[in-house]
Structures are given as structure tokens and as C-alpha cells.
Amino acid sequence: MLTKDLSITFCGVKFPNPFCLSSSPVGNCYEMCAKAYDTGWGGVVFKTIGFFIANEVSPRFDHLVKEDTGFIGFKNMEQIAEHPLEENLAALRRLKEDYPDKVLIASIMGENEQQWEELARLVQEAGADMIECNFSCPQMTSHAMGSDVGQSPELVEKYCRAVKRGSTLPMLAKMTPNIGDMCEVALAAKRGGADGIAAINTVKSITNIDLNQKIGMPIVNGKSSISGYSGKAVKPIALRFIQQMRTHPELRDFPISGIGGIETWEDAAEFLLLGAATLQVTTGIMQYGYRIVEDMASGLSHYLADQGFDSLQEMVGLANNNIVPAEDLDRSYIVYPRINLDKCVGCGRCYISCYDGGHQAMEWSEKTRTPHCNTEKCVGCLLCGHVCPVGCIELGEVKFKKGEKEHPVTL
């Protein structure tokens, strides 16, 4: 049971909660989107539609693992919806008729101004609440579409204007992360009439190489291709782009729908605290199913209550004041590790990592199989705490560097 109301108004549209399917295979037809709504998702971004009919490869997925974990990163070679345009429009109409209180976002992609304008008109007539312009799919076979467009501020601005000519609906521009400065493109979208930003789409990648056949994965008749990477591994990239946009003077109040590695309520809270107001998910659903929204909503609701927030909007962007340029960070002190020997299992990983990858400050007793920090050598990097498998190494004593004035420190 939710302890707090998770509704939020985004670009003038009220969402029952911030959790949405992102434009992808998880929202490819009426049946899938209906199940998502029934499970508790607040909105759906229907898989990108256009006049272009995708001819897909098989297989089309790959994944990246770390030791014995589930996959941490996911590669896909899918393009836009493979169904005919009329079939997709019919699905949009039916979804809005059957779920009038849920938010339906139509993702569109054209190859020229005329197509963008016409698609905008068609999805508004079909009942969509919002439009998301996909300027960022990294594996389109047409260079007039996808991330090639999203890297050009001029094209993004031009196509946003075309969409605004075709529709009066709120419109998001979906950003590609395959670019150095996302703010430049976001500003172009704003000039073109976009009401907000969706970020990020997938990262261009090669995930694995088959070492026997010397071919990238997945293998399609002896070949492979660069394509989009998603999942938990891209979350830091997404958070960085969102933070940079929300702290840009001309984008500070520009609404953002956050995408990239969200699969827990903690992930959701991080995106919200950096300035996203709605949240889109694909890879987490592909791995765990639509049901993950139940835990995400419950956890986020309890977090709001614990933190004393009355509404979701109150927490949006709060963390940005605490992210500063590297040159502004306090470099006057060292934090030494504190080792809880009651929890220590004597594995020695802290010692090995510090010796081979740090500053040889962690000493090791073969007799007791316990570590000890030599503060004469320790620089306070806390690598030891990050590699500890049982969490027995914590932040400990704060020591100010020679010549520095002592002052309160927040850890």
C-alpha cells in the first residue's frame, strides 16, 4: 500500500505516478501496454512509429555480465515498430479508449519535415496525450533517422517546428547520448518548440566478441554491428547528462523525462533528485517483467514519507546544488577507513586491492587473517571499502592535511 501520492504534473499532463514504459519492445502493441497499465505503470511511451517499416535482424540482443550477477548491460539491434502505421494508430486509439486515466505518449520518427508534421497530426487524432520525438535511435538503417539526426541541432530544431505545426500536444525531444554536449541539442529542441526533453536513449556499443569466430555479438549470419547499449551500466551516463541540462541557465526549468538503467526505487529517486520528473524503463522490464513497478512505487512512496516530502515535485532537482565543479571540492582532509572486524570474513580483498591498485596502506596479518590500515600511507581513497564483499569497511576518522584549518565536514 502506498503511503504517499505519487502523482505529478509533467508538461501540463497529470501522471498518476512517474513510472512509464519507454519507447521499445516492452510497449510494442495494445496487449503489452494494457498489461503494463493494469500492473500499475502511470504512463506508456508506445514503441516509435513512422512511415518507415523496420526489417529486423535475428538474433538482435546481447548482454554484459559481471561475475555471477544478472546482466548489467544490454545491447539491442531493434529499430522502430515493425507493425504498419495504421495498426499502430489503431492500438493508440484503443488504449486511450480503454485507459482514459492513464498517460499515453506517442513516440514518432520521420525522415523529413513533411513526415514529422503528418505523424504528429495522426497521433493526436488517435488520442495520444503527448508526443515524443525520437531523434536518437542509434541503429536505424536510414541515415535520415535516429541518432544521426539527434547529433544535429539544426535538424532537431527544424523537426521540432514541423511537429508543432502538425499538433498542439505537449512534445518531448528524445536525446542521444552519443554526443559531447547534450545541452546544445536540447536548446535547439527548445527553440523549435519542444516542451521538454527525454534523456537518454541507448549508447552506441559493441558488447562482446565471439573469440572463436572473431565476430561481434549478436551474430547475424557471420556479421554484427554497432548498436544501442542500455541497462544499469548506463545509469551514470544518464544522470550526468540530466544534471548538466538541469543546471544549464537556459534549461534549468525545462522538464525532463529520465531514462537509463532505472530498475529500483533507489534508481528512481536518484533521477528525480537530479531533475527528472517522470521516469522511463525498458531493460529492467525485459529482465524482471512489468511487476517491478510495484516495488518501485512502494519504495518511492515510503522514501517520500521518510524524508518528509508532501509531494513528488518537492524532491525534483534537490541534489543539483550539491554537485559542483571538481575544482570547488574540499581537498583539505583525508578520511581513513574504519574496519569492523566483527563483520570481516578474512577474505583479503581489501589488502590485495590496496597493494596492487592503491597505496599499499592496508596491512595484513596472516596469523589472524585480518586487515589493518597504516595511516602513514593511507590517502583516504576508500578503494578498500568498495571491494569489500561484506561491507565491513566504513568511513572513519577525518584528518586535516598539514596547514589546513579544521572545520565541520559532512560525510
Swiss-Prot record:
It comes from the Bacteria. It holds the Pfam family DHO_dh. One of its GO terms (biological process) is pyrimidine nucleobase catabolic process. CDD domains: DHPD_FMN. [4Fe-4S] cluster 2 binds at C354, C378, C381, C384. Residues 335-367, 369-398 form the 4Fe-4S ferredoxin-type domain. Disulfide bonds: none annotated. The active site is at C137 (nucleophile). Substrate binds at N76, N134, F135, S136, N201, T202. Its cofactor is [4Fe-4S] cluster. Induction: Transcriptionally regulated by IscS. Binds 2 [4Fe-4S] clusters. It catalyses: 5,6-dihydrouracil + NAD(+) = uracil + NADH + H(+); 5,6-dihydrothymine + NAD(+) = thymine + NADH + H(+). [4Fe-4S] cluster 1 binds at C344, C347, C350, C388. Keywords: 4Fe-4S, Iron, Iron-sulfur, Metal-binding, NAD, Oxidoreductase, Repeat. GO terms for molecular function: 4 iron, 4 sulfur cluster binding; dihydropyrimidine dehydrogenase (NAD+) activity; iron-sulfur cluster binding; metal ion binding; NADH dehydrogenase activity. GO terms for cellular component: cytoplasm; dihydropyrimidine dehydrogenase (NAD+) complex; oxidoreductase complex. Its EC number is 1.3.1.1. Heterotetramer of 2 PreA and 2 PreT subunits. PANTHER family: DIHYDROPYRIMIDINE DEHYDROGENASE [NADP(+)]. Involved in pyrimidine base degradation. Catalyzes physiologically the reduction of uracil to 5,6-dihydrouracil (DHU) by using NADH as a specific cosubstrate. It also catalyzes the reverse reaction and the reduction of thymine to 5,6-dihydrothymine (DHT). Belongs to the dihydropyrimidine dehydrogenase family. This is NAD-dependent dihydropyrimidine dehydrogenase subunit PreA. The gene is preA.
